[in-house]
Amino acid sequence: MYPDNFYSSTFTLLAEAEVGKHFYWDIAGFLVHGQVLVVVWFVLALLLLFAVLGTRDIDRIPNSWQNFAESAVDFVTDIARDQLGESFYREWVPFIGTLFLFIFGCNWAGAIIPWKLIELPEGELAAPTNDINTTVALALLTSLAYFYAGLSKKGFGYFKRYIQPIPLLLPINILEDFTKPLSLSFRLFGNVLADELTITVLTSLVPLVIPLPIMALGIFAGSVQALIFSTLAAAYIAEALE
């Protein structure tokens, strides 16, 4: 038999397990991952810059930046329309678009910019989406969004879905609301983390030669993950509105 302190120490180690090296900020008594906030601010600044450049001089004959902005808006509008239909998609375009562009920007920032070359006194910079806290937060926001969608349309009648088609399925229907954010968060986190770890290992073995194609694959995979996350978010909202 193992002593009780073996189990307690094991679970403590698992709870404290971290990926990468972090530096922390103490904000109102809470320790937050500072490297996540730094890169998030960088990505948000870039997205804001692109938005300003794309809408600064709107003309009937668009310039290159306006073309870029219009293409991005058309793309996220198509995602929302395909999942939500003509009746509901317009009000959800800002939310779906924000999810897609934020995840897209974070994934590309992690795939293109060599953050690990930036030396810090403590910790290291990386894509925000390779931190489980970021992906869980995005998944929980999505859960709040589809609960809001269902309640705003059906009121408390929305909860009837938990006993449909038969009341026997109540536990399964409740469990589904927990598995949705779990699958969203761990899918995004796992793919981004796997890509960064692969590049790190290959760079240490064969610098420049092998990592370049892997980086290109990471850029593609990051784009696909942003599309999958936003599409699933729109699909969950559409399901709540049915």
UniProtKB/Swiss-Prot annotation:
Transmembrane intervals: 34-54, 93-113, 132-152, 188-210, 222-242
A GO cellular component entry from the record: plasma membrane
CDD domains hit by this protein: ATP-synt_Fo_a_6
Subcellular localization: Plastid, Chloroplast thylakoid membrane
Species assigned in the record: Trieres chinensis
Similarity comment text for this entry: Belongs to the ATPase A chain family.
Assembly and binders: F-type ATPases have 2 components, CF(1) - the catalytic core - and CF(0) - the membrane proton channel. CF(1) has five subunits: alpha(3), beta(3), gamma(1), delta(1), epsilon(1). CF(0) has four main subunits: a, b, b' and c.
UniProt main location, coarse: plastid
Protein name as catalogued: ATP synthase subunit a, chloroplastic
Domain of life: Eukaryota
Gene expressing this chain: atpI
Bridged cysteine pairs (disulfide): none
Mode of membrane association: Multi-pass membrane protein
SUPFAM superfamilies attached to this UniProt entry: F1F0 ATP synthase subunit A (SSF81336)
